[in-house]
Amino acid sequence: MAKGPNNAARARKKVKKNVADGIAHVHASFNNTIITITDRQGNALSWATAGGQGFKGSRKSTPFAAQVAAENAGRVAQDQGIKNLEVRIKGPGPGRESAVRALNALGIKIAIIEDVTPIPHNGCRPPKRRRI
């Protein structure tokens, strides 16, 4: 019978980086909000999701859930030394604005807010209309 990896091999110590500038990637879908804070090269420093903060079901897709997730990701990034952020927002979800406000409220200086939502040049056919 094969054994899984033991806890000593799996648990790695977090290395504290000292990065002043970073990029906050906010992915706001209709169902969830994912915030990833990276350095300039794209290496992830911290991340948080609305679902990971304890919100389940339709509560994940609220602005408050996005705010809580952004606060958590921002606090961990501040521990890594982040002081300035560029914010790149992707998606049409309800957590777009509240995530940016939460990062700003933490005292992190936001230099640029950029919308990088992918827009098709008549690509794939969209899903059919909902009938309720």
UniProtKB/Swiss-Prot annotation:
The reply on keyword rRNA-binding is yes
Q: Which domain of life is it from?
A: Bacteria
> Annotated Gene Ontology MF terms?
rRNA binding; structural constituent of ribosome
Q: Which InterPro entries match?
A: Ribosomal_uS11, Ribosomal_uS11_bac-type, Ribosomal_uS11_CS, Ribosomal_uS11_sf
Q: Show the PROSITE patterns listed in the entry.
A: RIBOSOMAL_S11
Do you know which SUPFAM superfamilies this protein is assigned to?
Translational machinery components
**Pfam families registered for this protein in UniProt:** Ribosomal_S11
Keywords linked to the UniProt accession: Ribonucleoprotein, Ribosomal protein, RNA-binding, rRNA-binding
Could you describe the subunit structure of this protein? Part of the 30S ribosomal subunit. Interacts with proteins S7 and S18. Binds to IF-3.
Family that this chain belongs to: Belongs to the universal ribosomal protein uS11 family.
Q: What does this protein do?
A: Located on the platform of the 30S subunit, it bridges several disparate RNA helices of the 16S rRNA. Forms part of the Shine-Dalgarno cleft in the 70S ribosome.
Name used for this protein in its record: Small ribosomal subunit protein uS11
Q: Which organism is it from?
A: Cupriavidus necator (strain ATCC 17699 / DSM 428 / KCTC 22496 / NCIMB 10442 / H16 / Stanier 337) (Ralstonia eutropha)
Point out the gene that encodes the protein.
Answer: rpsK
